């Protein structure tokens, strides 16, 4: 599972997920999976989608993960009264804005890449689209 090795602070405020995304172009591979929706992507979802893609391409080609879960999410245990401080860190998320390229792939045909990204998209909590590298 992906998570930071060290952080400056153990817990962070909830914050808001507004604004426009960086990393909107396919820069490493030939094909990419781009987010259309906005949301939080957990480390487990990132890993599940990666596994689905790598199985679909039968371990050929190369896959790049363009997102990293760097925000800790805390939860209080069941049946605990309110108050008494912030809960414990339970999992890590990456905040995703529309237009962000989540995964990239190279070394496979477009048909195989489309199929692999379709399997990966089923594991994600927002809508995505298939994109190709634009050559200037």
Curated annotation (Swiss-Prot):
SUPFAM superfamilies: Ribosomal protein L16p/L10e. PROSITE patterns: RIBOSOMAL_L16_1, RIBOSOMAL_L16_2. Keywords: Ribonucleoprotein, Ribosomal protein, RNA-binding, rRNA-binding, tRNA-binding. Transmembrane segments: none annotated. GO terms for cellular component: cytosolic large ribosomal subunit. One of its GO terms (biological process) is translation. Pfam families: Ribosomal_L16. One of its GO terms (molecular function) is structural constituent of ribosome. Part of the 50S ribosomal subunit. Binds 23S rRNA and is also seen to make contacts with the A and possibly P site tRNAs. Belongs to the universal ribosomal protein uL16 family. HAMAP family: Ribosomal_uL16 (MF_01342). This is Large ribosomal subunit protein uL16. It comes from Glaesserella parasuis serovar 5 (strain SH0165). The lineage of its organism: Bacteria, Pseudomonadati, Pseudomonadota, Gammaproteobacteria, Pasteurellales.
């Amino acid at each position: 599972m992906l998570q930071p090795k060290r952080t400056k602070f153990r817990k962070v405020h909830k914050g808001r997920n507004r604004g426009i995304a960086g990393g909107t172009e396919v820069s490493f591979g030939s094909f990419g999976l781009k987010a259309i929706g906005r949301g939080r992507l957990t480390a487990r979802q990132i890993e599940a989608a990666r596994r689905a893609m790598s199985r679909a391409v039968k371990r050929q080609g190369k896959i790049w993960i363009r997102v990293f879960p760097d925000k800790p999410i805390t939860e209080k245990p069941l049946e605990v009264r309110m108050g008494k401080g912030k809960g414990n860190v339970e999992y890590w998320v990456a905040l995703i804005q529309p237009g962000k390229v989540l995964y990239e792939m190279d070394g496979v045909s477009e048909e195989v890449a489309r199929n692999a990204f379709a399997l990966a998209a089923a594991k994600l909590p927002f809508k995505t689209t298939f994109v190709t590298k634009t050559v200037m």
